[in-house]
Regions:
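A short, well-ordered alpha-helix in the C-terminal region of glycosyltransferases
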Residues: 332, 339-354, 363-366
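Nucleotide-sugar-dependent
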Residues: 11, 15, 211, 257-265, ...
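Donor nucleotide-sugar binding/catalytic pocket of nucleotide-sugar-dependent glycosyltransferases
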Residues: 35, 129, 143-189, 196, ...
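Nucleotide-sugar donor phosphate/pyrophosphate-binding loop at the beta->alpha transition
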Residues: 76-80, 118-121, 129-148, 184-187, ...
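Nucleotide-activated donor-binding/catalytic signature segment of Leloir-type glycosyltransferases, i.e.
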Residues: 238-265
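N-terminal strand-loop element at the rim of the active site
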Residues: 4-12, 26-76, 163-168, 177, ...
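Membrane-proximal helix-turn-helix segments that form the acceptor-binding/catalytic region
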Residues: 83-90, 108, 112-116, 122, ...
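Conserved donor-binding/catalytic core segment of Leloir-type glycosyltransferases
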Residues: 2-4, 157, 193-221, 228-229, ...
Length: 377
């Protein structure tokens, strides 16, 4: 099948999109990607890029906007992107059997622009009104449209079983769960903490508020026995860079590929996934860091009452602390250094039995096999 993925970031990197595209390309589908480059203004640029071992046609449009700046500040760029989606689909309508829309900010335009016989898969990374700063006056309207699209889609994908609770008004024709779990791209041999003196903390992701980024930087700057390895991009990047310049135990990597991320995390001791539980969507979050910690066998620190924190607590594979007390998690795991090896073994077992990408990719391939079969009837 000819599949068009649409994403509201440049997919450079975007681990979930990359894995899904690679999986479908491997299964024999002809996949192309339309993505939003927010760094600068430019017309659509076409490149051929490798996703796994497979070449994919990628189209990126540049519409300058600011990550994590909120709905109001990015409204104009968002509207421009909606128009760009419509125009792109119209131009390539004969090359599309299925539109795979990632989140509401691509689903809105693509659903109402899709060719009549085109199938529609709605991949809900984050439930929009619970995740983004949508003005109160618009939330009801946005949720109604979102629900309509879910109900009319050929399939809806969510990233954890818990997310079903968010789809409170919708009744999708088909609903499947694909966890944000990584493929095994690097050696996963457990690295003993005795191989280096400092406790190495790893974080790679969006550098924005609501994730205890600056709080972690401050803690590490004041505690020489720890070392923070941090990568990513976002609104807090200048402040993170400043911490790194002023503290030799904070190392900033900037934007990293997914393979680089996993490799760096594998050289560290502890992963963190702090999300502010006051944000409704964070209660259902499925952080990449959770799955990466399982696959790599690294103890994980999470905030209480956020997605997957109960799994960490139940299986004793890290530390779960109040969001306002990240330092408690660091000190708790430092004191439990002797338990890290056992935690690692439990994590890898969980990954293999419940969350492996092999299992997730089988679900995705089966979905598209079924769509293809129903198309040929």
């Amino acid at each position: 099948m000819k599949i068009l993925f649409i994403r509201s970031n440049p997919v450079n990197p975007d681990s979930r999109v990359e894995k899904e595209i690679a999986t479908l390309a491997k299964a024999g589908h002809d996949v192309m990607l339309f993505a939003w480059d927010r760094a600068s203004d430019h017309p659509i640029l076409h490149t051929e890029e490798l996703f796994g071992e497979y070449k994919v046609n990628v189209y990126r449009i540049g519409i300058k906007s600011v990550y994590s700046a909120g709905f109001k500040k990015n409204l104009r760029p968002l509207l421009k992107f909606q128009v760009a989606i419509h125009n792109f689909i119209k131009k390539h309508k004969d090359k599309i059997d299925v539109i795979h829309a990632c989140d509401f900010d691509t689903a809105f335009s693509s659903f109402f622009s899709k060719p009549r016989k085109c199938r529609f898969v709605y991949d809900v990374f984050d439930y929009y009104v619970d995740s983004f700063s949508v003005p109160e006056s618009l939330k009801g309207v946005v949720e109604k449209i979102d629900t309509h699209i879910m109900n009319k889609s050929d399939a809806v994908i969510i990233c954890t079983e818990e997310r079903v609770k968010q789809l409170r008004f919708s009744t999708p024709k088909r609903l499947i769960v694909i966890h944000n779990t990584p493929m095994k791209l690097v050696s996963m041999e457990y690295e003993s903490s005795n191989s280096h003196k400092k406790v190495k903390i790893a974080y790679v992701g969006i550098l924005s508020y609501g994730r205890n980024i600056l709080e972690t930087c401050l803690f590490v700057s004041q505690n020489a026995q720890f070392e923070l390895h941090i990568g990513g991009f976002g609104i807090l990047e200048p402040e993170v860079k400043k911490f790194a310049e002023e503290n030799e135990n904070i190392i900033f990597y900037g934007k990293m590929s997914y393979a680089e991320t996993l490799s760096m995390e594998n050289r560290c001791d502890i992963l963190i996934a702090f999300y502010d539980p006051s944000v409704p969507n964070h209660k259902f979050a499925a952080p990449n860091k959770f799955y990466e910690a399982l696959m790599l066998g690294k103890p994980l620190i999470m905030a209480e009452n956020t997605g997957m924190s109960e799994v960490v607590k139940k299986n004793d594979i890290g530390s779960v602390v109040p969001y306002s007390s990240p330092q408690k998690g660091f000190m708790e795991l430092l004191e439990r250094k002797a338990d890290w090896k056992k935690m690692s073994e439990r994590e890898k077992k969980l990954y293999d039995e419940l969350y492996s990408w092999n299992t997730m990719s089988e679900r995705l391939v089966k979905l598209y096999q079924d769509l293809k079969s129903s198309n040929s009837r």
